[in-house]
Every structure is written in structure tokens, then in C-alpha cells.
């Protein structure tokens, strides 16, 4: 039993994941890991085993990319690395600091904007996002949770983390075991995900004519 949060009332990890799984509304079947992935604001502050952290980055490493350019880079710090952790933490805006302060690991994804030959990589951000998704899904498989945060000071991250020109900070990620929402403020607790809401597929998937829903999802 790993990552057992107190708010699950001592359910097993599998039962806890099933409880979250039941919150999603999927008219068509998808993999359980995709159903179970979520972005919490409550983290348990216990450390993540190093082998699990290595597994996250190995998953990210195997993401697809244009011409196998692999533009993603990750800065990572655990709470044991106090100065490094604070360097990343201090880049977060106040609201995200309040939700991420218990997370034992912080990461910053960064995209290399050009190929090794110096030519621009127009898909660097897309490919870095795919690597992050691999990482997040792997975290779910290991009983961890990950919250991606766009609210951070990009210029401060560039300076404090010595990110060179030609690289773009993309997203900050807090990773940990699920925590107890009762330890949060009322405001943050109210923001914890309840029933995830997604637009219907008819609004997202078109035929080869813009905004004409694909015949896969047309009614009648």
C-alpha cells in the first residue's frame, strides 16, 4: 500500500484510484491511467523514492518528438536539496506556492527552441508537452500525483536557474503522494477537483471542414 492519503478513510491505493476514476464521465472507453490522472492541490510531504523519480524521467525520455529532436529538459529539486528547492519554489506565484508547499518534489520543464544544427524547432513546445504528459501518466501509475502550474515567474526562472538563451521555460510541476485536503485553507480545499468537466467531442473533433463535427460523433 503506497501513497495512502488519510482522506481516503484507509482504503487501499487501488480503491482510492477507483474512487477518483468514478468521478469521470467517459462515453467511450479509455485507459484507466488516463481516467485516474488528476491535478490535486493537496500533497503528502513524505519523500518520493528515488527509483520512482528516475522512472518518471525515463517515461518522459521516451516521448515522441519531431525528427527525434528531444527538445525537453527538466530542472528538478527535492526538499532535501533545500537551496535548489527554494530556487524553484520562489519562482511560483503566491497562489501556487500555497498549494505546492507540501509537495516533496518540484520540477520545471524547459524546451530547447532549436535543433542541434541551430535551425528553429517549431514543435519544441508541443514535444515538451508530450514528454510532460508521459511523466504525469507514469506518476499516476506509481501512485503519485502531479500538478502542472503555468503560474510562475518565467524571467525569474531564467535568471535564478541560469537557463540559457534558446531555451523556454514551459511549466512548473509539483509531484508527491496524495495529501489531506483538510490541511489546506478553505479556499484551496474548495478548489480541489470534484467532477472533472470536459467539452463534448462534437465541439472538439471536426471533419475536414472547420466546426463541422466529425461523422463519428454526429447525432442522427
Model-flagged regions — what are they?
Residues 2-220:
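Acidic, surface-exposed loops and disordered segments
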